[in-house]
Regions:
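N-terminal twin-arginine translocation
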Residues: 1-6, 18-37
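Active-site acidic/histidine proton-transfer and metal-coordination neighborhood
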Residues: 11-24, 37-47, 75, 109-224, ...
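Hydrophobic faces of well-ordered beta-strands that scaffold small-molecule active sites
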Residues: 50-56, 84-88, 117-122, 158-160, ...
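Catalytic domains of carbohydrate-active enzymes, especially glycoside hydrolases
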Residues: 69-89, 154
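Glycine-rich, proline-tolerant flexible connector loops at the mouths of alpha/beta enzymes
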Residues: 87-107, 165-166
Length: 333
């Protein structure tokens, strides 16, 4: 299947949604180095109840466009934003998962600059909720190399997607079985497998929390993305990432309800931002409300900045997001 067809298939899965998302019984079965002049000080966040990391996707345009190299991302994050923890996206080093020389160079750069590797976001490795057994097995095994890479880099987790085609019940059961298998494998590496609400069924908090209840393993959890509760989108005008990002949400799950449903299983938070008002607040997400919810659960892990707006440059958006999180978070400790 060529890349164009793969894109259409992947995007289509992210647009599917169903009218009902029941929680299934576990008994059901699935068939089928030196500082630069521009370097900023790393902000001390000890007064916050959470830690701040930077998701590599925030800089996707620079990375895809060749203005920024994946190996330079960690140092770039620290020198430009004062962020010393990073979240990788496998798309930017897709063929390097088992390249120990490459991974060793990446790890050495992080060690040299006191940067923490938090997780690897994994895409394009098949559908963990696939209802076809052989394809589902391939998807599970395709993620093994990222578990190994995550351990090598010192990450605590890999982020995966619970996608699949079929009814809500079928995809949930198959995703649960895949996650059980993958998390069992990952436990030998001290790696967690965390699922993001990432379109389709997974953007329904009740559905995804139900999958978590079915898996019920300590190293399997969620990565609530505060902006990813769209269950159905309009069709992209062309088959590019930019065109998909410009699509309109046609059906959206309540983000505050969804966040509440996913937080009990959270092993990370993805702080999605798009635009800001004159007071520096995100215009579409009430971060004061969200962070109070997060704080009430006792969460103390990483909140990863993921800027996806277009009105600001990526650097401006990242900086505004960090400032907002620190301002709101400091008032909740």
């Amino acid at each position: 299947m060529n890349s164009r067809r793969r894109f259409v298939k992947q995007m289509g899965r992210g647009m599917a949604a169903a009218a009902a998302y029941p929680i299934l019984s576990p008994l059901q079965s699935c068939n089928g180095r030196s500082r630069t002049a521009t370097q900023v000080e790393t902000t001390t966040t000890s007064e916050l109840f959470f830690k701040i990391s930077l998701a590599e996707w925030s800089l996707n345009r620079a990375l895809f466009g060749g203005q920024l190299d994946h190996l330079d991302f960690p140092q770039y994050a620290k020198e430009n934003f004062g962020i010393d923890a990073v979240e990788y996206v496998n798309q930017f080093f897709m063929d390097k998962a088992r390249d120990k020389a490459y991974l060793g160079e990446l790890k050495a750069r992080c060690d040299d600059h006191d940067i923490t590797n938090v997780l690897i976001m994994c895409d394009r490795e098949g559908d963990l909720g696939d209802t076809v057994p052989l394809q589902r097995r391939a998807a599970v095994e395709n993620h093994y190399k990222w578990v190994e890479a995550a351990q090598f880099l010192g990450c605590h987790a890999i982020r995966v997607n619970a996608a699949g085609e079929g009814t809500a019940e079928e995809v949930a059961q198959c995703a649960a079985e895949s996650l059980t298998e993958l998390a069992t494998f990952a436990s030998d590496y001290n790696i967690s497998v965390i699922v993001e609400n990432h379109g389709g069924y997974s953007s329904n908090g009740k559905w995804l929390s139900g999958v978590m209840q079915m898996v019920a393993l300590p190293n399997c959890g969620t990565l609530p993305d505060l902006g990813n509760f769209c269950m159905k989108r309009s069709d992209p005008l062309e088959q590019t990432t930019e065109a998909y990002m410009a699509t309109e949400c046609l059906e959206e799950y309540d983000r505050y309800l969804g966040t509440a449903e996913l937080l009990p299983f959270a092993k990370g938070i993805s702080a999605k931002t798009y635009d800001f008002d004159a007071d520096g607040n995100e215009t579409s997400i009430d971060y004061g409300r969200i962070l109070r919810m997060v704080n009430e659960t006792g969460f103390t892990g990483y909140v990863g900045i993921e800027y996806e707006g277009h009105s600001l440059t990526a650097n401006e958006g990242i900086t505004k997001t960090k400032t907002m999180l620190e301002r709101i978070g400091s008032g909740l400790t």
